[in-house]
Design a protein with these regions (language model features):
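Glycine-rich dinucleotide-binding loop and its adjacent helix/turn
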Residues: 110, 118-125, 133-135, 155, ...
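N-terminal Rossmann-like FAD-binding beta1-loop-alpha1 element of flavoenzymes
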Residues: 11-40, 232-237
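Rossmann-like dinucleotide/flavin-binding elements
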Residues: 210-248, 307, 328-364
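C-terminal, flexible cofactor-proximal segment of oxidoreductases
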Residues: 338-471
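A Rossmann-like FAD-binding core segment of flavoenzymes
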Residues: 237-320, 362-409, 413-419
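Glycine-rich FAD pyrophosphate-binding loop
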Residues: 31-58, 248-255
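Glycine-rich active-site loop/strand segments that organize a redox cofactor
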Residues: 44-128, 326-329, 369, 374-392
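Short hydrophobic core segments
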Residues: 17, 172-184, 224-226, 291-300
Length: 471
């Protein structure tokens, strides 16, 4: 690949925003490169983990509707000695993917643990993974703003932070920045007819899954859940055992029959209009549901970067994608700025490692980027091909990304650095069957410690079968 600029990168100080899964892997790979004078990680919570750092108290700051990414960050849900920020996790949550492919390349989950770990298991795992980079983390420190300053051909980034324990403001300059703030902060609640008026008349009826914690809160209530992605189905399944029967599940596309049976809900079409007087909704087929006690939106989140709003051109418009990036990672005009963790429907931990391996090598000048024109052309082609689902990867798209980035990283001109993971045939097979395996895990009481216990056994390919056939 050609160089992005005639001058090499001059990166000595690196900032990492966020000590969640992507921020931790970034710190590890940057250290392993042995090319940077300092790596500093800013984390607003008092512990690592990002979304996995659970807050029992939910956020009550959701806007209804919420369709704009240009909204200030949530305040902490608990003030005092250690402010805590609301997590999108809920009390009883298990991963959607088995730990055997979810894990980082150099650390297994406990082999005697559940094959689909609980949220507490994952948080404990991340704390363990963080041990050799914790000294880099400035906890309870929130990034308030980040400004680009150019010195010749080199970019510099001025970052202003606030210590949330004593209110002290600080400003530091960095040569490169890893933006690993995650994308589960700003909720998405669509602007449906009369939703504002409904919310004003019936405050608290409309909520988002980010504020969901326990199903007992819905005991005896008439409930409508909106959305049938993984979290929507899981939450609906929990609530349906406590609320008035049947729980209503509003969807755009039908739920697979086996999954719907497990949820125990009645599937209905999309909401067309809110009915204020009836405390109800009119659905797209004309059906009316009245006297709703809870309408829970499981409709995802918007990409948002409140500390980077001065960067031009802007990174986001409607919050559905991030603009100006090469390979969903490098800012094309300012490649000392990277955004790991944007791909959706991928296994995030190993993907974040693959991304970190590449940008650590690029910034140390042992790996090059294509010319700006080529990177821009890639983004244009990708946008035309994927449309609105720009960051949404197809089935096994993460396996392809791991292969691509592993090959890219291992073409480095230096032997320094940490090698990113790739999946073998067994792991690719596990990636292919995880949806069916998770459903079986739920149906059998969330007790299984292996895929074999659930009836899934890998069969090695015969000589005439291709890897694709096996997957």
């Amino acid at each position: 690949m050609g160089s992005v600029r005639p001058e090499p990168f001059d990166v000595k100080k690196v900032a990492v925003i966020g000590a969640g899964p992507c921020g931790l892997s970034a710190a590890k790979y940057l250290l392993a490169q042995q090319a940077f004078e300092s790596v500093v990680v800013f984390e607003q919570n008092p512990e690592v983990g990002g979304v996995w750092y659970y807050s029992r108290q939910p956020s009550d700051n959701a806007q209804v509707p919420q369709v704009s990414p240009f909204y200030p960050p949530d305040p902490p849900v608990r003030s005092g000695d250690k402010p805590v920020f609301a997590s999108p996790m809920y009390e009883v949550l298990h991963t959607n993917i088995p730990w055997t492919i979810m894990k980082y390349g150099d650390l297994d989950f406990p082999h005697d643990g559940l094959i689909f770990p609980s949220r507490a298991d994952v948080q404990e795992y991340l704390v363990k993974y963080s041990q050799d980079v914790r000294h880099l983390v400035k906890f309870s420190t929130q990034v308030k703003s980040m400004t680009l300053r150019q010195e010749g051909l080199q970019d510099r980034w001025d970052i202003e932070t606030e210590n949330l324990l004593d209110g002290q403001q600080s400003k530091e300059t960095f040569d490169a920045v890893v933006v690993a703030n995650g994308h589960y902060a700003t909720t998405h609640i669509p602007d449906v007819k009369n939703i504002k008026e409904f919310n004003a008349a019936h405050p608290g009826v409309i909520t988002h899954s980010k504020s969901y914690r326990v199903p007992e809160d819905y005991a005896g209530k008439k409930v409508l859940v909106v959305g049938n992605a993984a979290s929507g189905l899981d939450i609906a399944s929990q609530i349906s055992r406590h609320c008035k029967s049947p729980l209503l599940l509003s969807v755009h596309e039908p739920t697979p029959e086996e999954n719907l049976a497990h949820v125990g809900a009645e599937e209905v079409p999309a909401i067309e209009e809110f009915l204020v007087e009836e405390r109800g909704v009119r659905l797209s087929n004309g059906r009316v549901e009245k006297d709703l006690d809870a309408i829970l939106y499981c409709t995802g989140y918007l990409f948002t970067f409140p500390f980077l709003e001065t960067l031009t051109p802007g990174l986001v418009s409607d919050g559905r994608r991030v603009y100006g990036l090469y390979k969903h990672l490098f800012h094309i005009d300012h490649p000392t700025l990277v955004f790991p963790g944007l791909p959706i429907r991928v296994v995030p931990f190993p993907v974040s490692e693959a991304q970190a391996a590449v940008f650590a090598r690029v910034w140390s000048n042992s790996l090059s980027l294509p010319p700006v024109e080529e990177m821009s052309r890639w983004e244009e082609d990708e946008a035309e091909r994927r449309g609105k689902a720009f960051h949404v990867f197809p089935k096994l798209g993460d396996a392809d990304l791991l292969d691509e980035f592993h090959e890219w990283a291992t073409n480095s001109s230096s032997e320094k650095g940490k090698e990113p993971p790739v999946w073998d045939n067994v792991q690719k097979w596990q990636r292919g069957i995880y949806v069916e395996a998770k459903l079986k895990f739920e149906l059998t009481g969330r007790k299984a410690k292996s895929l074999e216990e659930l009836g899934f056994t890998y069969q090695p390919p015969s000589e005439v079968e291709s890897e694709q056939d096996i997957v």
